[in-house]
């Protein structure tokens, strides 16, 4: 009984310690979006750091692959394939889906990858990711930090609007033992909050 109570307390502490998403460093105006029908979307991972130690993606991948392969032969190699496919399979689709469910359904502005004909491009620059973990009795959410910039498609040096999304939490009801899926939930939360902010700004 004491063990169960202790685990429950530890779970509550971990849950309460999770930092909520925040937006910072907002600059520019979103007024240019009011008459738009399509916005191009690009995802960048050039500046990505991971974990509390801010390691590079290569450092993170090499260390985790080695750890998993040492635990079970081939496990790290299988994980690497999932990691490499996670961007296009989970992270980016979840972000785009929530932009559709917030901005597109409210304002009629579609957000699409590979839409070079669109006058404006949203650049989603993933800067920091914490994968989180799930140990059944306790878990910690993933966290995703991004810089979201609207630029002219034909002149990307011209930044019209930019904001920093800090530690968007990634989790879902129940248990999720996949780091990649938890991170995807963080991208989804980023888009959900950012989409609501866009709708709010365009009402002014």
Per-segment meaning from a language model:
Residues 64-71, 155-164:
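A structural motif
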Residues 1-25:
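Bacterial Sec-dependent N-terminal signal peptides
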Residues 84-92, 141, 176, 180-187:
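Solvent-exposed, acidic/flexible segments
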Residues 21-33, 49, 158-204:
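C-terminal/domain-edge helix-coil "capping" segments
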Residues 85-127:
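Short, solvent-exposed, polar/charged sequence segments at loop or secondary-structure edges
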């Amino acid at each position: 009984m004491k063990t169960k109570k202790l685990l429950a307390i530890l779970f509550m502490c971990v849950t309460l310690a999770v930092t909520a998403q925040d937006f910072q460093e907002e600059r520019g105006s979103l007024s240019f979006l009011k008459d738009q029908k399509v916005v191009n979307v690009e995802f960048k991972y050039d500046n990505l750091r991971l974990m509390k130690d801010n390691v590079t993606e290569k450092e993170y991948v090499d260390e985790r692959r080695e750890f998993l392969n040492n635990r079970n032969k081939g496990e790290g190699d299988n994980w690497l394939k999932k990691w490499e496919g996670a961007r296009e399979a989970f992270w980016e689709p979840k972000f785009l889906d929530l932009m559709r469910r917030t901005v597109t359904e409210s304002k009629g502005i579609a957000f699409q990858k590979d839409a070079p004909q669109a006058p404006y491009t949203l650049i989603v620059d993933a800067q920091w990711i914490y994968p989180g973990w799930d140990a059944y009795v306790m878990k910690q959410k993933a966290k995703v930090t991004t810089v979201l910039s609207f630029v002219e498609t034909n002149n990307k040096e011209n930044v019209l609007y930019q904001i920093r999304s800090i530690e968007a939490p990634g989790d879902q009801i129940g248990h999720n033992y996949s780091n990649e899926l938890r991170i995807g939930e963080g991208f989804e939360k980023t888009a959900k909050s950012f989409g609501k902010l866009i709708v709010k700004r365009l009402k002014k």
